Regions:
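Active-site-proximal alpha-helix that buttresses catalytic centers in soluble enzyme cores
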Residues: 1-73
Length: 73
């Protein structure tokens, strides 16, 4: 089974908030053996639909979506 973790942020027009979120995603990537993809609900890309499509295209048989609403923005 191939598992992919999608970390779902709210999204922001503030580049600093998006950068903080992406730092978290990079940290998770370095700590896990399975792929980790970012996604946003709005105001930033990629959206959740695009992240799911990417996961499926890479052969994922399990997709876990973890909401992460920690950053101001």
């Amino acid at each position: 089974m191939s598992s992919v973790l999608i970390v779902l942020g709210h999204g922001s027009r503030n580049p600093a908030a998006t950068a903080q979120f992406m730092e978290l995603v990079e940290h998770l990537r370095s700590a896990r053996h399975e792929p980790v993809l970012p996604a946003f609900m709005e105001l930033a890309e990629p959206g959740l639909d695009a992240a799911v499509e990417e996961a499926v295209a890479t052969g994922a048989t399990e997709i876990v979506v973890q909401p992460c609403f920690l950053f101001d923005g």
